[in-house]
Amino acid sequence: MCGIVGYVGFRNATDVLLDGLRRLEYRGYDSAGIAVRTPEGLKVVKRSGKLSALAEAVGKTPLQGALGIGHTRWATHGAPTDPNAHPHTTEDGRIALIHNGIFENYLELKEALEARGHRFRSETDTEVLAHLLEETYRGDLLEALREALKAVRGAYAVVVAHEDHEEIVAARTVSPLVVGLGEGENFLASDVPALLPYTRRVLFLHDGDVVRLTREGVEITDLEGRPVQREAVEVDWTLEAAEKGGFPHYMLKEIYEQPWVLENTLGGRLREEEGTVELGLALDPREVDRVHVIACGTASYAGLYGKYLLETLARLPTEWDVASEYRYRDPVVDSRTLALAISQSGETIDTLEGLREAKRKGARSLGVINAKGSTLTREVEDVLYIHAGPEIGVASTKAYTAMLAAMALLAVWFGRGRGALALEEAQRLLREMRRLPRLVEEVLEKRPLVAHVAEKYHQARDFLFLGRHVQAPTAYEGALKLKEISYIHAEAYPAGEMKHGPIALIDEHLPVVVLATKGPLYEKTLSNIQEVRARGGKVIAIATEGDEEIPRLAQDVIYVPEVHPLLAPIVSVVPLQLLAYEIAVLLGRDVDQPRNLAKSVTVE
């Protein structure tokens, strides 16, 4: 998501900041800014749009100083405008800060701060921290940051500078932050590429770390002020490898980014006490009688998951269409139909054409989109952004889980708005949704087990994926991932359909991946597993942690944490992504750019 750079040393800070931000452009952004400590005080320049606009503005008013912070922003709270760009400052302009992540409780903090006389100049969640720092600062910048962070809730990487201090202070929780160690200078960045021209000796900060950087050294403590030690490492990555975060492929990096992507998708939107979500939509849920989901590929499976949730939680009739077929079937549409278009890129031509057909017939429109400024964002009435950040790997991973989370948010929003979802059940769902980032982190720890399963089955010529209810789309997505990057033939079916044809394929050579997490249809899924075993099939089960029945039936079991059955696909798809990845690597495939595929399909 956002790019962060900080510098204290002997060089021209402006040059270091702009160079570092350029090296983080691959993360995506819609505005940029820097703050430099000059002899005249702290000076801030920020612009919406590309870095070139910022560089041009800085060129007109050069900032001379050897300490500064810089930021590229991917908008979450507030439009991509100059006032909403970072850095943000205290009202007296003496403290500047940059922030990656989301402060979930910013609205209540903002109301309290305004009641105490603070005046806000932006629409961002970040600015609340600037005002909190104004209250907590009493001469020690690091202590002021620690005290201010006690009030906020959410994911963050924060970097702060003060015009009276020859130091930068920073803190992180969930959002990444790395320290670069130099001689007579030190650096901060959200990712290693920004540091490579200056140093290869780095410290990776951990959750809860708070750091003070001066020219002479680095001091790290926890949020309570207790000293902590972080081991310095030498990175030998090329720039390309650094952009991959040290992972061998973008796809694997993006799989591992899913916990903080979910933080971004959900952050600031959950209102557990009220049992609702804040989506900022102009749409009135009571004016919609039916939904038409229009999407392609991975996005279409997220849409199918959305269909299950919209009908279950909101009692809202929902049709699901592959976008390339939608406009050719002459769909029945009226003014109370909502066309729900889902696309990572916002440029998928079949989705755009399907949306245009629905609008031509009078439908309302809502886009679930990752890429801001895309064609789809301009053609829909309302947008629900998934905030997944740039996805480089052709095979979608983090955008898919973000889309699933967005579908869950939308279903709760419709359910509460239409009076179909009880307060207690909504609160339960929202509490479970808040756990999702941590649960996905737990699943990622299972990678060695998934790699072992991949080793056993990577020579198979065919795979079958089975799932029921909300896990049927998970099966479809698992099969698609395997096909896309390993080139192994894979099919997916609702598990109850197996006996209506696919069962003829089952023999001792066919691995069958079964989504068998706990839920209302668990026992029926066990029966399907027994049917596979009776015909010699090899079962790879995705099961709920603690399930003692599954190991008696399946050759291989990959456990995922227990979660609300309607949210199980968000944790269950992760081992399927890893399985596809590990098999493709074993087969020597080009994981990030598989043959014949494009990231964004812009031709019919």
Swiss-Prot record:
| A GO cellular component annotation in the UniProt record | cytosol
Q: Which GO terms describe its molecular function?
A: carbohydrate derivative binding; glutamine-fructose-6-phosphate transaminase (isomerizing) activity
Entry keyword set = Aminotransferase, Cytoplasm, Glutamine amidotransferase, Repeat, Transferase
Task: Read off the Pfam families from this record.
Answer: GATase_6, SIS
> Is DNA-binding found in the keyword set?
no
Record: active site? C2 (nucleophile), K599 (for fru-6p isomerization activity)
A GO biological process of this protein is: fructose 6-phosphate metabolic process
Q: Which reaction does it catalyse?
A: D-fructose 6-phosphate + L-glutamine = D-glucosamine 6-phosphate + L-glutamate
Which residue windows are coiled coil? none
Q: Which residues form the Glutamine amidotransferase type-2 domain?
A: 2-216
Give the E.C. number(s): 2.6.1.16
**Where primarily located?**
cytoplasm
Domain SIS residues, every copy: 281-420, 453-594
Q: Where in the cell is it found?
A: Cytoplasm
Q: Does the keyword Iron-sulfur apply?
A: no
Partners and quaternary state?
Answer: Homodimer.
Per its UniProt record, what HAMAP family does this chain match? GlmS
Entries under PANTHER family matching the protein: GLUCOSAMINE--FRUCTOSE-6-PHOSPHATE AMINOTRANSFERASE, ISOMERIZING, GLUTAMINE--FRUCTOSE-6-PHOSPHATE TRANSAMINASE (ISOMERIZING)
The record's function comment reads: Catalyzes the first step in hexosamine metabolism, converting fructose-6P into glucosamine-6P using glutamine as a nitrogen source.
* Name of the protein described by the UniProt record: Glutamine--fructose-6-phosphate aminotransferase [isomerizing]
Protein species of origin: Thermus thermophilus (strain ATCC 27634 / DSM 579 / HB8)
